[in-house]
Amino acid sequence: MHKKINCLDYLLFVGYLILFAWLVTKLNFYKNSQLNNSQLIIIFLLKVMAGIFYGWVGVYYGNMAKMVDTWSYHYLSLQEFELLKDNPKEYFTNLIYYPYAEGYLKFFSTENSYWNDLKVNFFIKILSIFNIFSLGNYYINVIFYSFVTMVGPIAMYRVMINVYPAKKLQVILATFMVPSFLYWTSGLHKEGLLFLGLALITYCLYFGFKQNHWPFKRILVLILSLILVLALRNFLVILLLPAVFSWFLATRWPKKGLVVFVVSYLIYGILFFTIRYADERFDFPAVVVSKQEAFIAHSGGSEVDVRVLEPTLESFIINAPQAISLSSLRPYPSDVRHILSLAAAVEIFMLLLLFVIFLLTNTGGANSKNFIYFCVFFAFSLLFTIGYTVNFIGAIVRYRSLAFPFLIIPMICQINWTKLLSRLTISEKK
């Protein structure tokens, strides 16, 4: 049963909304983004509205759209808040304690694993802190969450506007206005914090490599961001490491960046399939297979039939087309079951149309090609991982939202819009 909203909740909601809308115009990290106060406030309010809509969908269409998690997390955070009042010692230690001693060693496991359970426990702990100030109100927590996670898109914007300084409008639209990205990273779920971590890692590395300057603050933010990603979805760190190392090598041979990335990823691929023979604890193909088995074992309304993956090179090659199709092209029109899946299908169609336009009119123009290689290789490694392991369209749409900014922003910025618009104008005159 949902908590009844009273007048105090409304007053707190309005008060916090005004306070944080004011704060986004005062913090230096936001002020130095080249966005004016009106733009910052609009972006913040868009995130709040998306987060409220996310919660509303969870209430009225949660079972149909398979979005009950957000409210489950909220109720668990209320229990955690009560624990803070009744047993502060346990509250401050239960994130570290785990009942299965061997669970600390099961980094990739989906059962009796400290690391697998940490993603939920950590997120609930954060929400419980919000509850101290919101009195346990879900929608007030949305305001807090929007304020905190807005750092992620702003960090990505600051990187991309440095890469494409003459494309401010395109960077703004592609960073903040992609519907699925805005929706999934604004709701009370892990994606907002995950992108915060990924974006800050990208921000620190980009300006660190560019300036060849690594002050203590930058290194600290980088480490904390890695810990955040590790806590919420540990396999993302595994995907980040080869992308970051390749980027680092490319900074040493800047004119051979693409060759560096291709050769590096070929080596990573070989290690992925062979390192298990040196140490069976690093049987990465088996880990991916176990993740797929865990998803297949679940039931839901958006699952699709998939070819079962085996821990062999041949199986991964055979399943590659299915993997990229699942993660990049679904839902098809035939997959549409409700308004959210319809919206996802329309969005994918529009993005594919933009991709075709990009192929026909690509202007290049990035200040750092090696950074773009990093974006592409990391994003596609994430998409392949999703496609190999997940067979629920709803989860796929949510997970892939993290990859979108790394691909969509460069794509939008490198389309020759002047040429495209001139052709459309000529066509209209004819």
Predicted features and spans:
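Hydrophobic, aromatic-rich transmembrane alpha-helices
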Residues: 20-23, 153, 323, 327-333, ...
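Transmembrane-helix motifs of polytopic, lipid-linked glycan transferases
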Residues: 22-26, 141-163, 353-357
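Membrane-interface helix-loop-helix junctions at transmembrane boundaries of multi-pass membrane enzymes
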Residues: 29-30, 162, 211-217, 356-377
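Transmembrane alpha-helix segments characteristic
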Residues: 44, 221-224, 367-388
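Extracytoplasmic catalytic/substrate-binding loops of multi-pass membrane glycan-assembly enzymes
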Residues: 58-76, 85-104, 114-126, 320, ...
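Juxtamembrane segments of multi-pass membrane glycosylation machinery
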Residues: 104-144, 331-336
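Short acidic/glycine- and proline-prone juxtamembrane loop motifs at membrane-interface regions
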Residues: 187-194
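Alpha-helical transmembrane segments and terminal signal-anchor/GPI-anchor hydrophobic tails
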Residues: 221-222, 226-347
